[in-house]
Amino acid sequence: GADCSGFVMSVFANFGYELPRVAAAQYSASQKRDLSQMEVGDLVFYGSGISHVALYIGDGKVVHALNSNKGIVITDYNYDTPVGVGSYME
């Protein structure tokens, strides 16, 4: 199974986007957005050192590789406290 950043990277690769491999680098390279401006396709980042990333799918939900036991899951975006939102979409 993919880890969180690998999952996001492979989803974006399907649409021709090349993202960095790790969550912190994905955040650094993204266009920052305010949480209130979040749009479908944005990335939501978690953890003090940006240790986790999820893909926003609308209606307050994200899809992400939670951990090796749970695999790919859909949860509320605020299942944990988001520390940032980034976009790769034009």
Can you name each region flagged by the protein language model?
Residues 1-40:
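Catalytic cysteine-centered active-site loop
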Residues 3, 51-52:
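Short loop/turn microsegments at loop-to-beta-strand junctions
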Residues 17, 23-33, 51, 57-90:
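Aromatic- and glycine-rich peptidoglycan recognition patches
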Residues 43-45:
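Hydrophobic beta-strand signal
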